[in-house]
C-alpha cells in the first residue's frame, strides 16, 4: 500500500510542478507520504468504497449495508446504563459546575462505568469495546442532552489515545493509557494562533537539551496552541511541534501540563480559555510554552503529520455519530412542542410543513448514523477510508445545520431562549462544519483521494507531456507567461510550435493510447449498463431483494456515481493543468459525489430497518434526488407519503430514533401546571 500510494502521489505532485506551483507540490508530496504511512500502519489493503463505486469494480450490496449490521450486533446494554445514569446526574443538577462546565462528579460517574477507557485494551485498564460501540456511546450521550460528554470522550479515545496505540512505545502505553482509562484528560494540540490547523506549517518547536535529558518546547505568541479541547491544568497533552526551529520534521510529544500557570523560573507556561461560544461546557484553551521541559522518552516516534492522519479518520467518523445524537435531541424537543402548540386549525403537529421539518431532522440523524457506522465497519475490515471518511464528516455536519434550521422553523423564538437546549447547541452545529477540517476543503481532498489511482494510471501521459512542454532545455520551469496550462485552440494560436511539439509527444506516448482504450472500454461497459438501466429495479437480481420503496434510490445512486467518472474525465480534458487551481468545478463534483453516496448509504442502511425508518430514508433520498435533478412531482409525492407514515408512527410513539429520549421543557410555557 505504501509503495502504491507513493507512486500515485507523483501524478498530483508532478501536475502542480508543471503548473508552476512548486511550493504546493512539495507540501502535497509530504502530506501524501504521511497519508501513505498512515495507510500502511492501518494495513488498509482494500480499495476505498467510494473509488470502487465510481471506477469499479462495484461493491456488493451486503458491503454497503454492513454498517447497519454492525450497529445491530454491537453490545449496547452497559453503554445505555452509563448514559442513563449520567442523565440522572444531569437531572439532579450534578452534571455541570456553577460556570456550566462538565463536573468532576459526572466524570467520576462515567469513569466508574469505564467510559473513558471504552475502546482501550483491557491490559491498559480499558473495556476493549469496538469503535462502533464508541460511536453508539457518542450518539447516545448527544441524544440525551450530554453532547459535551461525547465531545470530551471522543477526543480522548480517537485523537489522544490513538496516537499512543498506533505509534507509542510499550512503556508509553503502560504509562499513559491507564491514566486516560481512569478519566485523566488528554488534549491533542495541533492548531496554532498563526497558522491554524495547517500541520505542515506549525511553528511550535522543540530543541534538544542534552544536559537535562529533555526537549525544550517553545510555543510563544503566534505559536500558542489555540482551541485545544481538554487542555486543562494538570491534564495530559499531545503536542505537535517541529524538531528544531527551522526543521521540516514534525514530531509529537506527550506532556503533563502544570497544575497552574508558571511565569518565573526555568520555563514559562500558561493555559487560558479560548473564549469561544462553541463547546462552552467543555474545556477549550489557548496554551503557551516557553523553554518547557519534555523528557526525551515522551516523544512519540514517527512523522507527526502521519500520526495525525492516523487519528483523524476516527475523529471524523465519531463526529458523525455526535451529529446523529444531537439531531435526535432536537427532534424530541420539536415534537414535544408541536404536540402542545396550537396553530391554525389545531395542533402544530397536524400540519404537513412542521411534520416535514420533523422528518428532515429525524432523517438527518439516521443519515449521520448510517455514515458513521459504515465508515467504522469499513475501517475494521481493512478497507481504505479514502473519500468515505471525508464525506462522512462533511455530510453529517451540514445535515446538522439543516436540522437546526428546521427546528427553528417549528419552535420559533423559543429556540433563542438563553436557557434552551438549542441555544447551547447552535454554536456547536456551526462549529462542526469547520472542526476536523472545513467542509468544502474536505470535499476537494475527497475528490483528489478517490481519483488518484485513475489519474496516475490513465491521465499521467497527458500530465507528463504538459510538464515537458513547461520545462526549458536546462530542465527549469519556463516563465509564467510562456507556460502551457492546457492544449486548446487558443494555445495553438499563441504558441503554435510548442503546442505542435506537445501534441506530437502526446500521440507518441503509449499512455495516451492506454487512456483512449480505457475510455472506449468504459463507454462500452456503460452502454451495457444503460440497457440494464431500462429494466425496472424490482426485476433486477441486484436490487430486487431490497424493500420496494428503496430500490430506485440504490440504483439511481450507483448509476450516478459511475457517471461521475465521466464528469471527472471531462474536467481533466477541459482544464488540464489548470485543474490544479480550478477549485470551484472540483468542489461541484465533490458535492455531487457526496450527495450520491449519501443516497446510496442511507437507502442501503434503511433496507435493514423497520418500515418507519425506511419512510424517513425515502423522505431524505427524495429530497437529495431533487437537489441534484430539480423538483419532481413523483419525488414530492413520495416525500408526502413518507411524511404521512411518520406522522402515524408519531401518534403511536413508534419511531425508534426517539426511544427512551426525554424532551427538555420548552421556554415560556402557557400551561402553568
Regions inferred by a protein language model and the residue ranges of each:
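Flavin-dependent oxidoreductase catalytic core characteristic
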Residues: 2-155, 174, 178, 182, ...
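A short core secondary-structure module
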Residues: 214-268
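Short acidic, glycine/serine/threonine-rich loops at helix termini
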Residues: 130-133, 162-165, 197-202, 230-234, ...
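Beta-sandwich/jelly-roll carbohydrate-recognition scaffolds of carbohydrate-active enzymes
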Residues: 175-179, 191-209, 224-226
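A short, Trp-centered hydrophobic/proline-enriched beta-strand micro-motif
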Residues: 182-190
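N-terminal glycine-rich flavin-associated loop
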Residues: 149-171, 196-199, 339
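Short Gly/Pro-enriched turn/cap motifs at secondary-structure boundaries
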Residues: 194-197, 227-230, 242-244, 275-283
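Short, flexible loop/turn elements at secondary-structure junctions
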Residues: 124, 192-194, 210, 221, ...
Amino acid at each position: 500500500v505504501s509503495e502504491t500510494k507513493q507512486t500515485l502521489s507523483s501524478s498530483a505532485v508532478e501536475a502542480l510542478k508543471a503548473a508552476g506551483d512548486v511550493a504546493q507540490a512539495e507540501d502535497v508530496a509530504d502530506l501524501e507520504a504521511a497519508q501513505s504511512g498512515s495507510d500502511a500502519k492501518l494495513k488498509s489493503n482494500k480499495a476505498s468504497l467510494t473509488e470502487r463505486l465510481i471506477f469499479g469494480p462495484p461493491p456488493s450490496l451486503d458491503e454497503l449495508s454492513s454498517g447497519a449490521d454492525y450497529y445491530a450486533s454491537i453490545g449496547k446494554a452497559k453503554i445505555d446504563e452509563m448514559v442513563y445514569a449520567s442523565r440522572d446526574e444531569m437531572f439532579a443538577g450534578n452534571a455541570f459546575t456553577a460556570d456550566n462546565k462538565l463536573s468532576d462528579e459526572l466524570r467520576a460517574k462515567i469513569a466508574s462505568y469505564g467510559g473513558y477507557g471504552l475502546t482501550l485494551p483491557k491490559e491498559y485498564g480499558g473495556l476493549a469495546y469496538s469503535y462502533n460501540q464508541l460511536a453508539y456511546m457518542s450518539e447516545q450521550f448527544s441524544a440525551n442532552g450530554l453532547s459535551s460528554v461525547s465531545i470530551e470522550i471522543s477526543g480522548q479515545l480517537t485523537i489522544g489515545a490513538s496516537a499512543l496505540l498506533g505509534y507509542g512505545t510499550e512503556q508509553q502505553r503502560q504509562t499513559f493509557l491507564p491514566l486516560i482509562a481512569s478519566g485523566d484528560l488528554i488534549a491533542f494540540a495541533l492548531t496554532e494562533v498563526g497558522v491554524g490547523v495547517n500541520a505542515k506549517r506549525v511553528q511550535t518547536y522543540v530543541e534538544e537539551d542534552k544536559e537535562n535529558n529533555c526537549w525544550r518546547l517553545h510555543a510563544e505568541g503566534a505559536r500558542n496552541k489555540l482551541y485545544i479541547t481538554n487542555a486543562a491544568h494538570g491534564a495530559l497533552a499531545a503536542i505537535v511541534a517541529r524538531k528544531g526551529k527551522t526543521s521540516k520534521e514534525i514530531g509529537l510529544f506527550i506532556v503533563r501540563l502544570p497544575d497552574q500557570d508558571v511565569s518565573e523560573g526555568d520555563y514559562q507556561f500558561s493555559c487560558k480559555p479560548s473564549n469561544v461560544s462553541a463547546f462552552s461546557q467543555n474545556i477549550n484553551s489557548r496554551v503557551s510554552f516557553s523553554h518547557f521541559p519534555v523528557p526525551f522518552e515522551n516523544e512519540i516516534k514517527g512523522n507527526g503529520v502521519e500520526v495525525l492522519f492516523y487519528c483523524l479518520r476516527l475523529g471524523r467518523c465519531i463526529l458523525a455519530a455526535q451529529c446523529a445524537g444531537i439531531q435526535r435531541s432536537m427532534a424530541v424537543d420539536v415534537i414535544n412542542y408541536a404536540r402542545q402548540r396550537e396553530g391554525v386549525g389545531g395542533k402544530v403537529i397536524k400540519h404537513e410543513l412542521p411534520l416535514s421539518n420533523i422528518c428532515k431532522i429525524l432523517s438527518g440523524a439516521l443519515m449521520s448514523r448510517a455514515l458513521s457506522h459504515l465508515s467504522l465497519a469499513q475501517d475494521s475490515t481493512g478497507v481504505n477510508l479514502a473519500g468515505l471518511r471525508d464525506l462522512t464528516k462533511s455530510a453529517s455536519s451540514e445535515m446538522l445545520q439543516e436540522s437546526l434550521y428546521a427546528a427553528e422553523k417549528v419552535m420559533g423564538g423559543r429556540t433563542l431562549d438563553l436557557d434552551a437546549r438549542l441555544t447551547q447547541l447552535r454554536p456547536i452545529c456551526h462549529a462542526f462544519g469547520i472542526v476536523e477540517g472545513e467542509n468544502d476543503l474536505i470535499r476537494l481532498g475527497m475528490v483528489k483521494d478517490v481519483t488518484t489511482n485513475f489519474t496516475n494510471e490513465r491521465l499521467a501521459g497527458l500530465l507528463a507531456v504538459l510538464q515537458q512542454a513547461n520545462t526549458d532545455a536546462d530542465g527549469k520551469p519556463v516563465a509564467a507567461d510562456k507556460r502551457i496550462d492546457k492544449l486548446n485552440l487558443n494555445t495553438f494560436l499563441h504558441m503554435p510550435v510548442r503546442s505542435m511539439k506537445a501534441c506530437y509527444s502526446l500521440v507518441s506516448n503509449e499512455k495516451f493510447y492506454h487512456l483512449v482504450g480505457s475510455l472506449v472500454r468504459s463507454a462500452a461497459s456503460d452502454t451495457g449498463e444503460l440497457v440494464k438501466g431500462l429494466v425496472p429495479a424490482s426485476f433486477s437480481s441486484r436490487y430486487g431483494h431490497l424493500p420496494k420503496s428503496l430500490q430506485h434510490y440504490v440504483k439511481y445512486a450507483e448509476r450516478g456515481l459511475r457517471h461521475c467518472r465521466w464528469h471527472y474525465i471531462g474536467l481533466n480534458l477541459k482544464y488540464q493543468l489548470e485543474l490544479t487551481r480550478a477549485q470551484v468545478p472540483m468542489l461541484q463534483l465533490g458535492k455531487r459525489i457526496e450527495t450520491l453516496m449519501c443516497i446510496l448509504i442511507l437507502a442501503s442502511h434503511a433496507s435493514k430497518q423497520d418500515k418507519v425508518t425506511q419512510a424517513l430514508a425515502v423522505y431524505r433520498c427524495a429530497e437529495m434526488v431533487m437537489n441534484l435533478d430539480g423538483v419532481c412531482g413523483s419525488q414530492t409525492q413520495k416525500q408526502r407519503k413518507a411524511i404521512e407514515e411518520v406522522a402515524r408512527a408519531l401518534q403511536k410513539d413508534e419511531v425508534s430514533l426517539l426511544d427512551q429520549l426525554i424532551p427538555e421543557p420548552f421556554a415560556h410555557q402557557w400551561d402553568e401546571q
